[in-house]
Amino acid sequence: MVHSDDGTDYTLSAQLLSYAMSIIEEAALPSSAYSLGGGTVLSYLFHHRKSKDIDLFVNDAQYMGALSPRFNEYSDRALSYNEDGNCIVLSFDEGKIDFIAATQITDYPAKMQSIFGQRIAVDDPVEIVCKKIYFRGNRAYPRDIFDLAVLYESSRRTDLITELKKYPDKVKQFADAFQKNRSDPCIEPYSTIYADSLLAGGKKFAGREFALCQMLLQELAGTA
């Protein structure tokens, strides 16, 4: 079994990452071509919410074909998959593996670390959250808002704000989606919908993520 410092079980994540590394090895990707990011890495670092799926970011779209179940023996072992030019989603009994074609967008590069039983480049938390806003901010998912609030309240607040200011159009897109969702009575905060998924580090943010996100947006707009 694989546990974080707070005792959270990441055995399923470790198994998924093991599958992913076999797929990468079969595709003969150099170690410099990919990094581990996404919500499960944030969960492991901040102990705020449960997450098990694996997100791997590939810095050159030309590698995506070699990862596809159409050409990769190990990918083909997935129960099912979805694929487009920039993303491959593989479903296993343990959860999902996403291979996403995306370059680094912040000044905080991935660093080699040991995580979930593997030695791999791991994205910086600021990079992870900025990617959420940059690539899918127009949807403002509740879990992304929760992750954003947690990082905003951490020691990385200044780093986060500095990086987000580089992408005003993406921030505006996110802000518009956030305000629309916030005014929709059918859309509730992540901490309300998935209260049972909150870990020790996330319980203090319960019911606060919308307000914290609003504070961040005001700070980015210079109105805080």
Language model: regions and residue ranges:
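Compositionally biased terminal segments of proteins
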Residues: 1-224
